[in-house]
């Protein structure tokens, strides 16, 4: 399982509209950017409590990249 599949698994387990979840991956020499799109009604689930949910998810996903000496970030589009 790669980081996109893992992120998709986490997000789909907490949102209502699972079909609206999409993730785009862009990589350069230093960074990997995962752009996350969810249904407008599910945004509160992802950003809940001043971003605590998405920040926790970001920390989990970053574990994938510690050994590769790359940085990863997740951007949530509204």
Name each model feature, range by range.
Residues 47-51:
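Glycine-centered tight-turn and secondary-structure capping sites
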Residues 1-45, 55-78:
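RNA-contacting regions in translation and RNA-metabolism proteins
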């Amino acid at each position: 399982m790669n980081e996109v599949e893992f992120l998709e698994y986490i997000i789909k387990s907490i949102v209502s509209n699972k079909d609206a979840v999409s993730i785009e991956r862009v990589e350069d020499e230093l960074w990997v950017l995962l752009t996350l799109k969810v249904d407008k009604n599910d945004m509160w689930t992802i950003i809940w409590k001043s971003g605590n949910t998405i920040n926790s998810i970001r920390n989990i996903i970053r574990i994938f990249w510690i050994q590769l000496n790359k940085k990863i970030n997740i951007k949530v589009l509204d």
